[in-house]
C-alpha cells in the first residue's frame, strides 16, 4: 500500500510542479485546453487501466480526475500568473508531500475526518509548506507590504489545510486551489 500511494503522489508532485509554471510560457486558453485534455486522458486511462501508478490506491477517490479540474478552476479565477502558480504548488507540494510523509511517517498519530484517516504528520507537512509558499509570495511584495498583510500568511495556510482535511474522496484537489486563489486574489500582488 505504501509503495502505491507514494508512487501516485510522486506523479502528483511532479506533474503539479510542471503545471504550476505553465502561465509563464502558455496562454490561459492553452492551459484550459490542456486541463480538459488531461481530464480526458485520466478518464480514459481509468477505463483502460493504464497509468497504474495514479490509479493504484485502495481507498475510494476521485482525486486523479479532480486534479485537472482544480487546475482549470485556478486558471479561470487567478488574478495573476503568480496566484495560479502558488495555488497549483499547493496541490503539488503541500498536498503531495503531506500524503507522502503522512503515509510513511504518520501511522502512529492519526485522526479521522468523515471516517477517513488523516495523519498529524501529513497535516503539519501541509501547513508548513503552505506557510512557506504564502509567506514567500507576501515577502516578494516588499517588507512594508508583508507587515501589512501578515494576516494572510497566518490564516490562508490554516484554511487551506482545513479544506485539505475536509476534502475527502479527492475533492481537496478542487477545494485547496479554490481557497488559495480566493485568498491571494484579495491581495494586490505585483
Predicted regions and their residues:
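N-terminal, motif-rich segments that launch catalysis or mediate targeting to/interaction with membranes
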Residues: 32-39
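Interhelical loop and helix-boundary elements at the membrane-water interface
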Residues: 1-31, 43-190
Amino acid at each position: 500500500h505504501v509503495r502505491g500511494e507514494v508512487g501516485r503522489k510522486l506523479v502528483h508532485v511532479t506533474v503539479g510542479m510542471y503545471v504550476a509554471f505553465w502561465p509563464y510560457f502558455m496562454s490561459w486558453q492553452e492551459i484550459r485546453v490542456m486541463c480538459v485534455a488531461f481530464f480526458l486522458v485520466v478518464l480514459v486511462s481509468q477505463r483502460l487501466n493504464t497509468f497504474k501508478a495514479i490509479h493504484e490506491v485502495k481507498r475510494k477517490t476521485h482525486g486523479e480526475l479532480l486534479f485537472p479540474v482544480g487546475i482549470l478552476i485556478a486558471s479561470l479565477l487567478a488574478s495573476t500568473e503568480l496566484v495560479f502558480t502558488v495555488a497549483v504548488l499547493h496541490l503539488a507540494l503541500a498536498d503531495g508531500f503531506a500524503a507522502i510523509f503522512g503515509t510513511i511517517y504518520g501511522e502512529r498519530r492519526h485522526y479521522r475526518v468523515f471516517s477517513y484517516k488523516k495523519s498529524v504528520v501529513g497535516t503539519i507537512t501541509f501547513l508548513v509548506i503552505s506557510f512557506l509558499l504564502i509567506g514567500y509570495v507576501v515577502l516578494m511584495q516588499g517588507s512594508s507590504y508583508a507587515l501589512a498583510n501578515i494576516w494572510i500568511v497566518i490564516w490562508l495556510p490554516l484554511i487551506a489545510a482545513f479544506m485539505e482535511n475536509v476534502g475527502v474522496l479527492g475533492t481537496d484537489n478542487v477545494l485547496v486551489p479554490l481557497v488559495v486563489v480566493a485568498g491571494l486574489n484579495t491581495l494586490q500582488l505585483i
